[in-house]
UniProtKB/Swiss-Prot annotation:
Residues 249-396 form the Helicase C-terminal domain. Residues 40-216 form the Helicase ATP-binding domain. GO terms for biological process: endonucleolytic cleavage in 5'-ETS of tricistronic rRNA transcript (SSU-rRNA, 5.8S rRNA, LSU-rRNA); endonucleolytic cleavage in ITS1 to separate SSU-rRNA from 5.8S rRNA and LSU-rRNA from tricistronic rRNA transcript (SSU-rRNA, 5.8S rRNA, LSU-rRNA); endonucleolytic cleavage to generate mature 5'-end of SSU-rRNA from (SSU-rRNA, 5.8S rRNA, LSU-rRNA). A motif (DEAD box) lies at residues 162-165. A motif (Q motif) lies at residues 9-37. This is ATP-dependent RNA helicase DBP8. Keywords: ATP-binding, Helicase, Hydrolase, Nucleotide-binding, Nucleus, Ribosome biogenesis, RNA-binding, rRNA processing. SMART domains: DEXDc, HELICc. PANTHER family: ATP-DEPENDENT RNA HELICASE (PTHR47959:SF24), ATP-DEPENDENT RNA HELICASE RHLE-RELATED (PTHR47959).
């Protein structure tokens, strides 16, 4: 059920250590959010927890705060593990743990696909205090790296599943079982599940029998997550677009007066579409980067750094970027391809209008997307309005010819470089290595 908690308490009153409150203050984080006020005291009491709150609500501090507070009382060995579905989200969480624990010389290990397995094994052998990982790569170490590397997992006090609704799907099932199997039994550790979408599968965990010697699981939902799906500061609009000229409409929207200087994330459903758009927009002098699962990790990291630093003002991404990533300056989200799952629309759109800021989410609708839009509008309980910033005549007059030329050149270059074959090879390598994202 949804619980109401006063947000007038400060972090010290919630029970966090003095040093951690000072660290938060140095980061200008002084007032707890609802999810933090609701979960931190109960976690500090030793309770397992399910926390649900909209994207951008401060869920990381809701679990990191109590973990760091209790770790600081005995700062030795492997203390906690955070599992999350994507590499970029793992990197972000690791950065937050490192920043929060900087006063205490915290050791944080990042264990994700695409990075050196040997270097990660060496990090794990040094017994980091906290491990932030994607399930596939951590499972690989558990199965292959030996007890010197992963033996410390048997003594961890905390397991966190961030974006729990995704981690509990079949995609991660085998790797998650491997990871959990290397940890202490659940009656000897705290398990914390956090998500922006509390699914029936997550909620059903409340009905599990209470372990002997443990308190009942605590579930806290902010603003009834299932009914209040998007921020009130988010403006949702649509553009009716002929399928064969979507790129021209996109270019016209990105360069119109309203958005010519805006930072934007463009979501597509396929990696090939992301690459075509990246090359097309780059040829049209748009500062652009891309992010998708088939990119080498160094390129993914570089793209995120460029976008955060505003070296690229547009990021083209698949749904690897739709969860949890906190880039406060994003002003515009474009759903270039409409997702089949309405919750995916919610997570994508949540990359803007964060922490009370205003933002726009604009969806490109072709004749095949009508049923999907109807499902999305039913899920968010509101109707989208038509965007008035792009018109057929303007697209035809200003954009169509040069955009079509840039797209043709992009497709020819990709064919020459055997992009599709390279993608298949990368996918096979990913599957072989047991890396999910």
């Amino acid at each position: 059920m949804t619980e109401e908690v006063s947000r007038k308490q400060n972090f010290r009153q919630l029970g966090l250590s003095k040093w951690l409150v000072e660290s938060l203050d140095a980061m200008r984080i002084r007032t707890p959010t609802a999810i933090q006020s609701g979960c931190i005291p109960e976690i500090l009491k030793g309770r397992d927890c399910i926390g649900g709150a909209k994207t951008g609500s401060g869920k990381t501090i809701a679990f990191a705060g109590p973990m760091l507070t209790q770790w600081s009382e005995d700062p030795t060995g492997m203390f906690g593990i955070v599992l999350t579905p994507t590499r970029e989200l793992a990197m972000q969480i690791a950065e937050q743990f490192t920043a929060l624990g900087s006063y205490m010389n915290i050791r944080v290990a990042l264990v994700v696909g695409g990075e050196s397995i040997v270097d990660q094994a060496l990090q794990l052998q040094r017994k980091p205090h906290f491990i932030i990982a994607t399930p596939g790569r951590l499972a690989h170490h558990i199965l292959n790296s030996g007890d010197d590397t992963v033996g410390g997992l048997k003594r961890v006090k905390y397991l966190v599943l961030d974006e729990a609704d995704i981690l509990l799907t079949e995609t991660f099932s085998n790797d998650l079982k491997t990871c959990v199997g290397a940890l202490p039994p659940k009656e000897k550790r705290q398990t914390l599940l956090f998500t922006a979408t509390i699914t029936d599968q997550v909620r059903a965990l409340q009905d599990a029998p209470v372990q002997k010697g443990k308190q009942p699981l605590f579930c806290y939902e902010v603003e009834n997550v299932d009914n209040v799906a998007i921020p009130s500061t988010l403006n949702t609009e649509y553009v009716l677009v002929p399928e064969h000229v979507k790129e021209a409409y996109l270019y016209q929207l990105l360069t119109c007066e309203s958005y010519a200087n805006s930072t934007a994330i463009i979501f597509v459903n396929r990696t090939t579409a992301a690459e075509v758009l990246r090359r097309t927009l780059k040829a049209l002098d748009v500062r652009v980067a891309s992010l998708h699962s088939q990119m080498p990790q160094q390129e993914r990291t570089n793209s995120m750094h460029r976008f955060r630093a505003n070296a690229a003002r547009v990021l083209i991404a698949t749904d690897v970027a739709s969860r949890g990533l906190d880039i406060p300056t994003v002003e515009l989200v474009i759903n270039y391809d409409i997702p089949s799952d309405p919750d995916t629309f919610i997570h994508r759109s949540g990359r803007t209008a964060r922490a009370g800021r205003k933002g726009d989410a604009i969806s490109f609708i072709t004749q095949r997307d009508v049923s999907r839009i109807e499902a999305i509008e039913a899920r968010i309980n509101m109707k989208m309005t038509e965007c008035d910033k792009v018109h057929d005549t303007a697209v035809i007059r200003k954009a169509l010819t040069k955009v079509s030329k840039a797209k043709r050149e992009a497709l020819m270059a990709m064919e020459k470089e055997n992009f599709g074959e390279r993608r298949k090879l990368q996918k096979r390598k990913t599957q072989k290595d047991g890396k999910r994202v």
